[in-house]
Amino acid sequence: MRTLIENLEFALTVDRNDTVLAGASVVVENDRFRDIGQAVDIAGRHSRDSFDRIIDGSRFGMVPGFIDSHVHLSETLSRAVFPDCLSTRAWVFHWAKPFYAAVTGEDEVVGAKIGMAEMLRCGTTCFLDMGAQNDVRGVVEAIEKIGLRGITGRHAADVRPEQIPPGWTEEMMRHHFFPDAKSALRELEKTVKDFDGTAGGRIRCWCNIEGKEPCSLELHVGARALAEKLGVGTTYHLATSIEEAKVSERKHGKWPVARVAAAGGLGANLVIAHCVAVEDQEIVLMRDAGTKVAFCPATSVKLAKGATRIGKYPEMMAAGMDVGLGTDGVSAGGNMNLMRQTYLVAGMFKDCRMDSTLVGARKALRMATLEGAKALGWGDDIGSLEVGKKADFVLFDLDHYEWAPYGDPLQAVVYSASPASIAQTWVDGKALYCGGQVVTVDERALRTEARRRAADVVKRAGLTGETPTVTTTYD
């Protein structure tokens, strides 16, 4: 299938030079970009008769598909369920854990589908999921059906709290925790061997673990080593809050990143989620190891993680680290809209440090596209509009009020636009969102089922006004 999208008003390529093409045309052949350039040049190189489909792009602007570097598909049914007054540790141990324990395999599949449908409406074409709480097969099959590009795995942890926290049960403990690191690693290896490379390589499977206190140091180090042996990656939460860092220092004499680094747990195949509480020397350790970071600005804002006060993301990027953006789970980040994260990161460090040169629109867009792709080990194939790369892209409707009028398209994408003006989202050379609908799923039926299942999960989890909003778990 050869497709010509001609006379685009602009194309933000996010290539090495951040080239902005005005009056551009793009040739898509099957699942890849075959030619990109000025419309007049493309017309001279390709006969119109050679195309199976020609799309008038004169009212469209094109950007690379957005890449969500940290998301929880298993959490999608928890939208706006947890209180608005939780710090990170209370949110995890007293609300998220009981919720996850109540999610069945069928719930998880429905949550994954509705999460991915929302992603497509928001221009996201690729994601890194923390992993299934139940049967990975169901989530993999959901990704295959919806058509997104993604990475998933089997969620793993191996350190139980010394005492069962309020609201937890022994059944819940068995659901969440493997008996030890070795059994967790065996399951991770099986999962990777079963599912990595599904759907012609569009779906990858990693050795993902929860990270931080619910995982032993052996599991942190072992997951990365296993991933290296299998030729895949791993991701986990670490340094997610100053509270976590202080507990780590009191218990182990080191902050979280330094502790894992001392044990040999950092590496180029590791994506650390959040990474809010780090010291300067830990940035050096991560940079030297090639470790990547997924920053979730909206979660930091809601859970008071302190990114604007103690976060060192500008320093990480200045050191040469790949820092992508993530939406996290909807109970923390609010939704699957990576454009919201892009807007936040473009401006939050300007404001908190009173330095208007920090981050900005150009860097924010790179974080949401190419740097996210590099973090996920997919930088050679996606993340920018370049010949030979996969045809994953977003078309904005420039006849929308968000674009009437506009000057600099780069600033307009980051500061002015929203998913409301997204006309189409393409993955692998296929338009998965167009005409106001996701074409691979019955969205109305999906929303109805998601609402029903969400209410049942919350009831089974016992999440009520009596659920604690502070915690001493793992202290």
Regions found by a protein language model. Name each.
Residues 1-24, 29-34, 45-47, 366-475:
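Active-site microenvironment of metallo-dependent hydrolases
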Residues 8, 26, 31, 59, ...:
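Divalent metal-coordination and catalytic microenvironments
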Residues 77-110, 158-179, 242-267, 289-292, ...:
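Active-site gating loops and adjacent loop-to-helix segments of metal-dependent hydrolytic enzymes
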Residues 79-149, 183-200, 451-453:
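Alpha-helical scaffold segments that flank or form the walls of functional sites
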Residues 141-277, 281-283:
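Metal-coordinating catalytic core of metallo-dependent amide/deamination hydrolases
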Residues 242-255, 282-288, 304-316, 332-350:
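Histidine/acidic-residue-rich catalytic or RNA/ligand-binding cores of hydrolases
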Residues 262-269, 314-400, 416-417:
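His/Asp/Glu-enriched, well-ordered alpha-helical/loop segment
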